[in-house]
Design a protein with these regions (language model features):
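Solvent-exposed alpha-helices and their adjacent loops that cap or buttress functional pockets
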Residues: 10, 25-30, 47-51, 76-79, ...
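Acidic, Ser/Thr/Pro-rich beta/coil linker or hinge segments at domain junctions
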Residues: 183-228
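Active-site-proximal betaalpha loop/short-helix elements
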Residues: 87-163
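Glycine-rich anion-binding loops of enzyme active sites
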Residues: 1-73, 194
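Active-site glycine-rich loop that binds ribose-phosphate moieties when present
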Residues: 34-45, 81-103
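Helix N-cap motif at beta-to-alpha junctions
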Residues: 170-177
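Aromatic/hydrophobic pocket-lining residues that form π-stacking "cages" and hydrophobic walls in ligand
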Residues: 2, 6, 123, 147, ...
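Short, compositionally biased
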Residues: 68-85
Length: 228
């Protein structure tokens, strides 16, 4: 099943699987997959190109993967529409289309996929790695209704929840091309903040208070003993 999925995705991306290795161990109770991708690119985006004043955008809505995992753990009662929403989330976890499109634009200075630790963790990682900071705005964060409901009912912060499927992109200057490229793909593209010249990532909350953001464990670790 794992390799069937890998082969299907490789064909979709027009890439070749050239080798592999499998083994069994009593120490490992679940399948673990790791991979290495090798290829050529015309332009390399580096975190060191990030500069104060760059604006931060995210694609799609946040915590897509986290919502799917959380639903699998807590088994909430879902309407048929919510079940279809989960299926749509699950099929939207790749960022290949938007990352390829954005990487071609001179206005995009850096990108970082939003995985463990959510969007706050991703912003902290990319900024701290180059000695910069950021202002992030809670009111601008794109969180789907189902995600918000499941997170609220289970004491989870969606901004710190694994968000595979979202790409964090820094845009310098005119954002017209970037917005047009994402619109052409049918991908939401939301501005959530800007890079600053200090070393603090600040979340400006909807109630007017602020919070200094650090790289912390993902919210799913709250359920580490329940995910079987």
């Amino acid at each position: 099943v794992i390799m069937d999925g890998a082969v299907k995705e490789a064909k979709r991306l027009n890439v070749e699987i050239v080798g592999g290795h499998t083994e069994f161990s009593d120490c490992v109770v679940r399948p673990i997959v790791s991979g290495t991708a090798i290829g050529k690119v015309k332009r390399v985006l580096k975190k060191t190109d990030l500069q104060p004043g760059d604006r931060l955008f995210v694609t799609k809505s946040l915590a897509l993967e986290g919502t799917c995992i959380l639903a699998d753990i807590v088994k909430p009662a879902l309407t048929e529409e919510e079940k279809r929403t989960l299926e749509r989330f699950n099929s939207s976890l790749s960022v290949s289309r938007e990352s390829v499109a954005l990487s071609k634009l001179d206005s995009v200075s850096a990108m970082h996929d939003v995985t463990e630790g959510g969007v706050l963790g991703a912003a902290a990682e990319i900024c701290f790695s180059v000695g910069l900071g950021a202002n992030l705005y809670e009111s601008k964060m794109p969180v789907a209704e189902l995600t918000a409901r499941l997170c609220e009912s289970n004491g989870v912060d969606p901004l710190r929840l694994i968000s595979s499927g979202s790409m964090l992109a820094a845009v310098r200057g005119d954002d017209t091309e970037a917005k047009a490229a994402m619109k052409a793909l049918g991908v939401e593209f939301t501005e959530i903040g800007e890079v600053t010249d200090d070393t603090v990532v600040t979340l400006i909350k909807t109630n007017g208070t602020t919070e200094n953001v650090d790289v912390l464990p993902d919210e799913l670790y709250k359920f580490s003993g329940e995910s079987k």
